[in-house]
Amino acid sequence: MSSADGALVLFSGGQDSTTCVAWALKRYAKVETIGFDYGQRHAVELEVRPDVLRSLRDINPEWNKKLGEDHMIDLSLISKISNTAMTQDVEITMMENGLPNTFVPGRNLLFMTVAATVAYRRGLDVLVGGMCETDFSGYPDCRDDTMKALQVALNLGMATRLKLETPLMWIDKAETWKMAQDLGGKPLVDLIRAGTHTCYLGERGALHDWGYGCGTCPACELRARGYANFAAQEK
């Protein structure tokens, strides 16, 4: 267990953030979660959040004791100041800068800043996020350098010693599935597979081996490929 007492986990209801909640529950005495409603097209992720949290409590009695308050924050202003495939009903395409139009400029910067403010009020020393720059779509606000710079800025701006943890930063999606198995065994893998949501289009009609989704958006492709590689390694 970490020497830090408490952590606040950015929890969307997806695979990565659910894995991060379990990771934090293994390390910290007190864990709270925070989610953001920013007018996302795949708002179904917000709908599954309460069920995922309840299931995490059921998987491990110790997790139930540690898991505290869930904070839901309205950041609908993001959809008002951005024009992306994450907040608008438009086709997912690549932009001239090489990024998919699912990139929401400043989103993770704003998420972390708001989360740091909540952590300050709640007396929590650690922020945990599922950012990753191995299996990812190239978003610049998911990079390790961005998170390190943001940690410095937040601590300077609030005179704190807040730590930003990104346990998935240097692992691929197959390793993320393996981390979930190591943390919570088959029950956690099954919960992530059937209970969480990642698909950018909000598709929850068909349950695939890797979970629900359209199977063609960047998020589904990463999740499906990661699960296939994970399953192959487990045989």
From Swiss-Prot:
EC number(s) reported in the record: 6.3.4.20
Positions contributing to Zn(2+) binding: C199, C214, C217, C220
Binding residue positions for ATP: F11, S12, G13, G14, Q15, D16, S17, T18, T19, C20, V21
Catalytic activity: 7-carboxy-7-deazaguanine + NH4(+) + ATP = 7-cyano-7-deazaguanine + ADP + phosphate + H2O + H(+)
Cofactor(s) of this protein: Zn(2+)
Note on how the cofactor is bound: Binds 1 zinc ion per subunit.
Alphabetical keyword list: ATP-binding, Ligase, Metal-binding, Nucleotide-binding, Queuosine biosynthesis, Zinc
Annotated metabolic or biological route of this protein: Purine metabolism; 7-cyano-7-deazaguanine biosynthesis
Entry GO MF terms: ATP binding; ligase activity, forming carbon-nitrogen bonds; zinc ion binding
A Pfam family: QueC
InterPro entries: QueC, Rossmann-like_a/b/a_fold
GO biological process: queuosine biosynthetic process
Zinc in keyword set: yes
Coiled coil: none
Keyword DNA-binding: no
HAMAP family listed in its UniProt record: QueC
Similarity section: Belongs to the QueC family.
Role, per record: Catalyzes the ATP-dependent conversion of 7-carboxy-7-deazaguanine (CDG) to 7-cyano-7-deazaguanine (preQ(0)).
Official protein name in the record: 7-cyano-7-deazaguanine synthase
Taxonomic classification: Bacteria, Pseudomonadati, Pseudomonadota, Betaproteobacteria, Burkholderiales
Underlying gene: queC
